[in-house]
Amino acid sequence: MTMSTIPESLNSPVSGKSVFMEFGPPSQQMSPSSMTHGHYSMHCLHSSGHPQHDSAYSPAPSFPRSLPYPYVNSVGSHSSSPYLSTVQTYPNNSALAQTRLEDPAPESEKNTVVEGGEVRFNGKGKKIRKPRTIYSSLQLQALNRRFQQTQYLALPERAELAASLGLTQTQVKIWFQNKRSKFKKLMKQGGGTIDTNALANGRGLSTGSPSVAPVWNTTATVKTSTPTSYIPSYTSWYPTAHQDTMQQPQLM
């Protein structure tokens, strides 16, 4: 009798609950809902020997089927787990990820450095051409007069000239560099002779060589002389040819 009563007491619902509490982790506090699900999972293991308790522990249709391990069900009661927190905050992080993708564009603009009139990105050698500076006639005359005096300017002279003309020092420096390069080309082409007046007015840099003007004068004289010699010859030929054609039918 004593041996038969011991298994019955172990198979009772109260004894199953006490066994579940003994084998569960001591530090983990469980809610009543998790305890009921845990007891149901323990009862599923012994349901083959006691079919009469299946109706009392039938699962509700709104709850999913619990796993046989009790500590798995306790995860749902604890919202402070790292996995659940990351899952809950994942939709909120989509806006942050989108803003992070849009951040590199302003950062590349901040890293632009202007060095000597050249724009460089992140210190690399990529250059972007700036629009050309349009000088007025008064500025060009002053720059040409100063270039006739000296081809190289010191820093104080360049600063003074730029301030007087309303230009930057970089613009004055670039203009003098271009002027010197063109002047050297003209010296090579013209054999070292350039009119000083044309250089002061800036005309010597626009023409290819000083010998171009006489060529234009010769072509102009040829064009004016050819029509005078061509028109009388044509008028003298036309009446004779017309008279010959008129006389031939009369002879026939």
Swiss-Prot record:
One record GO biological process: embryonic skeletal system development
InterPro entries, alphabetized: Distal-less_Homeobox_TF (IPR050460), HD (IPR001356), HD_metazoa (IPR020479), Homeobox_CS (IPR017970), Homeodomain-like_sf (IPR009057), HTH_motif (IPR000047)
GO cellular component terms listed in the entry, alphabetical order: nucleus
DNA-binding region per UniProt: 128-187
Domain of life per record: Eukaryota
Keyword Nucleus belongs to the record: yes
Compartments where located: Nucleus
Keywords, ordered alphabetically: Developmental protein, DNA-binding, Homeobox, Nucleus
Leader sequence residues: none
Record PANTHER family: HOMEOBOX PROTEIN, HOMEOBOX PROTEIN DLX-1
Family, as annotated: Belongs to the distal-less homeobox family.
Protein name: Homeobox protein Dlx1a
Species whose genome carries this gene: Danio rerio
Phylogenetic classification of the source organism: Eukaryota, Metazoa, Chordata, Craniata, Vertebrata
